[in-house]
Regions:
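Cap/insert and terminal regions of metallo-dependent hydrolase folds
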Residues: 2-18, 211, 220-222, 228-331
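Binuclear metal-dependent hydrolase catalytic cores
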Residues: 2-228, 311-342, 347
Length: 350
């Protein structure tokens, strides 16, 4: 009993001392200084000499806590790309303190809002991060007019900020430098070690819509964008290290559709019915991975994103019978493929 009282007394003294210590201005300043240093310092999240992908947005438009809409941050050696910029993804990039100095381009798969909503935020963050020329954007036909719309919407904002901050935000660096592509397949980027091929997929009525094959030295990935199940996905994914594929979980969506109809929310019920015909479902995606003999399948653009154990089990219903080496992504999932190796490393960015 005496020992318990002694420990309790020490705890009370410690808490009181800590409280008064935190009222000290010097202590407050030091703690805040440490926070600010961590906030403003760029952080390197990628391995050297590797093909790496960080999932900066893992969900579809259906809301889910702690998840942004579709976005992948790709590092191929010393070159960086952002594939799609859905709502909330720029916040993740900012929170991870991404260094934009080696950003080659933003690449857009198609022009649905959940793939482009944060394009301006990425443009602004990289401008604030020291970019000296307009942001390079590569995308399908229609990308130029979309970028022009963003540029016009924030034109006055850019002028105000440039006039206020001067040379650190040169007005000539504001905006977008757009390259559009078309056709069934197109080489959209190439340097000594890296190739990116865009190939057409089916997300009708969205047309065009593209997937991407990215090769860095001896490593490779395919990113589906949004598509139904297609043989062309198998063709381009044949033997790649990792396939990142959008996926719709029919057991979840059909249950949500039924409940929406029962409670009289006919608009939501209709939308949930409609989306089932232009996304591959989880079982179909697993079959694509099996037929292509990929080493790892990563589900992203999750429709809907699982929120708990039960919904994840429903999301994956039928998948294990077809393909077992898969990973259900979350915001911060990091997949690294070191060059000259067969390793596939999976981590989570804090």
């Amino acid at each position: 009993m005496k020992f318990f009282k002694y420990i309790l007394t020490l705890l009370v003294v410690f808490l009181i001392s800590g409280y008064f210590l935190l009222q000290n201005h010097s202590v407050q300043n030091r703690l805040f200084e440490n926070t600010v240093r961590a906030l403003f310092q760029t952080d390197e999240i990628f391995m050297n000499d590797a093909l790496s992908v960080a999932v900066c947005g893992s969900r579809a438009p259906l809301p889910s806590p702690n998840r942004a809409e579709t976005c992948l941050l790709v590092q191929a050696g010393t070159s960086k790309f952002i594939i799609d910029t859905g709502r909330g993804s720029a916040d993740n990039l900012q929170r991870w303190r991404v260094d934009y100095s080696d950003l080659e381009a933003v690449i857009l798969s198609h022009l649905h809002s959940d793939h482009i909503s944060d394009l301006h935020e990425v443009q602004f963050q990289s401008w604030l991060g020291g970019r000296k020329t307009p942001l390079s954007v590569i995308g399908p036909i229609g990308t130029a007019s979309t970028a022009q719309g963003f540029e016009q919407a924030f034109k006055l904002d850019s002028i105000y900020r440039s006039e206020h901050h001067g040379a650190i935000l040169p007005i000539e660096a504001y905006g977008y430098d757009v390259v559009e592509f078309e056709g069934d397949a197109k080489l959209i980027f190439e340097n000594e070690d890296t190739r990116i091929i865009a190939f057409k997929v089916d997300h009708s009525p969205v047309d065009p819509s593209y997937a991407f094959k990215i090769e860095y030295k001896d490593r490779s990935i395919v990113v589906s964008g949004d598509t139904v199940s297609l043989d062309v996905m198998v063709e381009y994914s044949k033997g790649v290290d990792v396939l990142f594929h959008d996926a719709l979980a029919k057991p979840l969506i059909q249950e949500m559709e039924k409940i929406s109809e029962e409670i009289g929310n006919n608009i939501v019920s209709k939308v949930l019915f409609d989306i089932q015909d232009y996304h591959a479902n989880t079982v179909e995606v697993a079959d694509i991975a099996r037929r292509a003999e990929v080493d790892l399948l990563v589900f992203y653009h999750l429709i809907p994103a699982p929120r708990n154990y039960i919904s994840e089990q429903m999301f994956l219903r039928g998948v294990d019978e077809i393909f077992t080496n898969y990973h259900v992504s979350e915001d911060g999932t990091l997949v690294s493929l070191p060059a000259g190796s067969d390793e596939i490393l999976i981590d989570l960015i804090d």
